[in-house]
From Swiss-Prot:
Belongs to the peptidase C12 family. BAP1 subfamily. Residues 457-471 have a biased composition (Basic residues). Residues 405-471 are annotated as: Positively charged C-terminal tail required for binding nucleosomes. This is Ubiquitin carboxyl-terminal hydrolase calypso. The keyword Protease applies. InterPro entries: Papain-like_cys_pep_sf (IPR038765), Peptidase_C12_UCH (IPR001578), Peptidase_C12_UCH_sf (IPR036959), UCH_C (IPR041507). Residues 375-403 form the ULD domain. It is an enzyme of class 3 (hydrolase). GO terms for cellular component: chromatin; cytoplasm; PR-DUB complex.
Length: 471
């Protein structure tokens, strides 16, 4: 398909209709201007992605945008340094009452002017399960290129889709192989099975049986825009005061949105910020601190050397010239410079630790991605087969997979049995203790007479004796 054509051909029609698969032999022209290439990688369609800042950060790197990262926002009131935009994930249930309230509210701020729509990057989501990539591109492709290096793929996509309709921009995204392959490379194996089992539909970003959706909030020309690929138009929330930042306007919009959405005690959402790579700012700060450290250290050495020469008795000696661009020796004593040098050493150590922490985070992003995307099915099947071959699988199943009701019933029976045994033991003990005095008397009589005492006659014998006496 020719991306600039905006949906020409059967393949574009299939994508627009929501097909989740393409032919193995399909040849597509990408929006990046590359030559046609086999698209076997896209044969299974776009897959669902988790809502994870580490995943999104690695996905941006795969897109070719290296100086950006994604962070999760836990507190709206906490200031965020230089964000490019925000990505909001929420549960998508069309019939929900709060959802209808949001639709009624946002319908009033739709931007329907075609010229205004063409001047920004707004793409409709015509490819299922691509909402994560749509949300990232809605932020990145509406940023000032002077402040952000997009990379070759995204720069060409932005250039070639300029002036397209929102639907054609969505088709261009869906048929850009670099984006699709990068997107699918971060999906879990369950996503492919879920796609094969349920088919295409609204993207669900966590496998809980409920649909979730991403939208983006970005500042464009002094206005706060909300870009939702499932809406027909972009939404303009208006501008902000000169004395405030655009994030202040965003906080007010989100506070109102969450107030509506949580009217039924539903707070299942999360918020992420697209920000500059923190390591760049830390590295730049470390460079400045080390430069200042070298200047202060050099000035201190010269000052100490001059003081030593003065104390040696050479009164005619002059202090050597020192740099005047940053520090004047006459304005600082040796103690002042030593204190300043100590503070610089502390700041350098703190920032080095911050840089190490950020690098460790990136490493853990990669570790988590490997665990997330690895298919453990073969290992699990082989492991269970080995257990069955050794004849221990059945025993393990009987030990660990018993029904809970059966287990609880056996526990109750055991408790009753223990109580019965305890009661029986108590009764026998009481009887034994009651017969103890009588037994002692018998033992005493035996010891005195040398023979066992006669047994006490029973009731029947006593009755006969009474009758004989009467006679």
């Amino acid at each position: 398909m020719n991306a600039a054509g905006g949906g020409s051909g059967a393949q574009a029609a299939g994508v627009a209709a929501g097909n989740s698969s393409l032919s193995h032999n399909a040849l597509l022209s990408t929006a990046s201007g590359a030559t046609t290439m086999p698209m076997a990688q896209l044969a299974d369609g776009w897959l669902e992605l988790e809502s994870d800042p580490g995943l999104f950060t690695l996905l941006l790197k795969d897109f070719g945008c290296h100086d950006v990262q994604v962070e999760e926002v836990y507190d709206l009131q906490k200031p965020i340094e230089s964000p490019y935009g925000f990505i909001f994930l929420f549960r998508w249930i069309e019939e929900r009452r709060a959802r209808r309230k949001i639709v009624e509210t946002t319908a009033e701020i739709f931007v329907k002017d075609e010229e205004a729509i063409s001047s920004i990057f707004f793409a409709q989501q015509v490819v299922p399960n691509s909402c994560a990539t749509h949300a990232l591109l809605s932020v990145l492709l509406n940023c000032n290129e002077n402040n952000l290096q997009l990379g070759d793929t995204l720069s060409r996509l932005k250039t070639h889709t300029k002036g397209m309709s929102p639907e054609n921009k969505g088709l261009a995204i869906g048929n850009t192989p670099e984006l699709a392959c990068a997107h699918n490379s971060h999906a879990m194996p369950q996503a492919r099975r879920r796609l094969e089992r349920t088919g295409a539909g609204v993207s669900s970003c966590r496998f809980t049986g409920e649909a979730f959706h991403f939208v983006s909030f970005v500042p464009i020309n002094g206005q706060l825009f909300e870009l939702d690929g499932l809406k027909p138009y972009p939404m303009n929330h208006g501008g902000w005061e000169d004395s405030e930042d655009w994030t202040d306007k965003f906080r007010r919009v989100m506070a109102e949105r969450l107030g509506i959405a949580t009217g039924e005690q539903d707070i299942r959402f999360n918020l992420m910020a697209v920000v500059p790579d923190r390591r760049i700012a830390i590295t730049h700060k470390l460079k400045m601190l080390r430069t200042n450290q070298a200047i202060v250290s050099g000035t201190l050495q010269k000052l100490l050397k001059a003081d030593e020469q003065g104390e040696s008795g050479n009164g005619d000696s002059q202090r050597p010239d020192t740099p005047t661009t940053l520090l004047e020796p006459s304005a600082f004593t040796a103690r002042d410079l030593q204190s300043l040098l100590k503070n610089l050493d502390t700041e350098i150590a703190i920032n080095e630790q911050h840089l190490a922490d950020e690098n460790d985070r990136r490493h853990m992003f990669k570790v988590d991605a490997s665990r997330r995307t690895h298919n453990y099915d073969k290992f699990i099947c082989t492991f269970l087969s080995m257990l069955a071959h050794q004849g221990v699988l059945g025993e393990l199943v009987s030990q660990h997979l018993l029904p809970s009701k059966k287990v609880s019933g056996q526990g109750a029976a055991n408790r009753i049995s223990k109580q019965s045994n305890t009661a029986s033991a108590g009764g026998s003990t009481t009887g034994a203790s009651a017969s103890t005095p009588k037994t002692q008397q018998q033992q005493a009589a035996t010891a005195k007479n040398g023979k066992s005492p006669s047994k006490t006659p029973g009731r029947r014998r006593k009755g006969r004796n009474k009758c004989r006496k009467r006679k």
